[in-house]
């Protein structure tokens, strides 16, 4: 199979160990990812962000292929049991292709909106391990043990730590791929870094215990700027894209819409166009895998369009605002006002303004808190190797990353219907909550 890709150029998956990727791509479960946008409603802020989870899955498999080539170029010094054999490579390619298989509509939004809905990681494992799925059968056609091995890799578990971390770790194929693709689609420059040189800089860190497989490390003489650029790119993408005000506002509104619909369904209301999976989730009932796989962006869009004609005026209003991109406005809190106590005071002020206007404060005003740790302080950190001396943790070698390690990037915003914003800001200033 040969494909043209705007991020990676010519992408190919040949016979042998790579043949599992085209097999998986042809399954209904992977094809479903064509109907789920990678960045949800980020296109409300960045019009080009219409790329799909499917494109990311193919790209992740391509990055894994490049990583496998590099690992094989340097694994000759390892004992055979620690080397990347053909069956292990096939498992890794499959895991890279399938790692996001369980995502629901608009990526993370669905699982966050309705309490009790399993997260996408759990759905991914269910799809891989369920004997009735085409994905499971495709894996089974290669090897009877392949579904279990691929599921373990998706969980970040493998006898070879370097392979587990390639699927789920600080420097994994998922992050390597989505940064480049998201930057390309949104038109920003922050997510670009030198993937080719970063892969070229990979080494194995020697371990004293010969029974343990070595960890993957960065060549300190060549790769330090490349890994710094990679981690800083992730930081900048969170600052400028993933936590963008318009995106977060749209996400908040959709969560509010889904929560309102779930509440009405729980109270016995029948909402036209609602997928069966949403009805079950609203009642707190388990969602069968088949019903979950019917969910995609189109199903949710159709449902929300139908909800514009519902009897509940609040649901109608929210659904209409989302479709028309009439986004809620935000007011960002800083310093003491962003602390847990400060944000609650600010929210209370905003709620009082909403009540004064006869609006439901549980719907038309809210607190949006988004956070991430771009450079995690890990117990098992990424290592850097030099010609002399033992491997050292990356954050000990890079003064830039040492300053960032463990730091939480957070945005705390009051979200509200547009007509309330000026009055809310005045009320916050008058109360001292916006000082």
Where are these regions (language model features)?
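Aromatic-lined, polymer-binding surfaces characteristic
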Residues: 98
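Histidine-centered, transition-metal-coordinating active-site segments
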Residues: 1-93, 101, 105-435
């Amino acid at each position: 199979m040969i494909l043209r890709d705007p991020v990676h150029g010519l992408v190919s998956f040949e016979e042998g160990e790579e043949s599992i990727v085209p097999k998986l791509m042809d399954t209904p479960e992977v094809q479903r990812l064509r109907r789920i946008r990678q960045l949800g409603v980020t296109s409300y802020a960045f019009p080009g962000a219409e790329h799909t989870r499917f494109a990311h899955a193919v790209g992740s498999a391509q990055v894994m292929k490049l990583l496998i080539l590099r690992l094989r170029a340097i694994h000759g010094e390892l004992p055979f049991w620690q080397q990347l054999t053909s069956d292990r490579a096939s498992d890794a390619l499959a895991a890279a292709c399938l790692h996001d298989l369980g995502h629901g509509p608009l990526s993370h939004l669905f699982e966050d909106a309705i309490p009790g809905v399993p997260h996408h990681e759990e759905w991914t494992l269910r799809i891989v391990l369920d004997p009735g799925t085409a994905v499971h059968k495709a894996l089974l056609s290669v090897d009877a043990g392949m579904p279990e091995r691929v599921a373990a890799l998706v969980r970040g578990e493998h006898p070879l730590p370097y392979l587990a971390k390639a699927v789920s770790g600080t420097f994994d194929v998922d992050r390597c791929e989505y940064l480049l693709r998201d930057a390309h689609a949104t038109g920003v420059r922050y997510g670009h870094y030198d993937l080719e040189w970063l892969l070229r800089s990979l080494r194995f860190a020697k371990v004293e215990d010969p029974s343990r497989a070595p960890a993957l490390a960065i060549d300190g003489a060549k790769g330090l700027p490349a890994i710094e650029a990679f981690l800083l790119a992730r930081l900048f993408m969170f600052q400028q894209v993933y936590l963008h005000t318009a995106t977060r506002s749209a996400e908040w509104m959709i969560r509010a819409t889904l929560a309102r619909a779930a509440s009405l369904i729980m109270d016995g209301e029948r909402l036209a166009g609602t997928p069966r999976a949403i009805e079950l989730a609203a009642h707190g009932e388990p969602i069968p895998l088949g019903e979950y796989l019917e969910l995609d962006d189109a199903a949710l869009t159709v449902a929300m369009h139908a909800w514009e004609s519902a009897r509940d005026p609040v649901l109608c209003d929210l659904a209409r605002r989302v479709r028309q991109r009439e986004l809620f406005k935000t007011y960002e809190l800083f310093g003491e006002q962003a602390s847990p106590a400060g944000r609650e005071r600010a929210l209370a002020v905003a709620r009082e303004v909403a009540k004064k206007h006869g609006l439901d404060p549980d719907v038309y005003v809210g607190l949006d808190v988004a956070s991430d740790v771009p450079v995690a302080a890990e117990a098992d950190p990424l290592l850097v190797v030099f010609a002399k001396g033992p491997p050292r943790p990356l954050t000990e070698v890079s003064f830039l990353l040492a300053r960032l390690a463990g730091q939480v990037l957070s945005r705390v915003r009051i979200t509200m219907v547009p007509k309330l914003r000026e009055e809310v800001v005045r009320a916050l200033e008058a109360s001292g909550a916006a000082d």
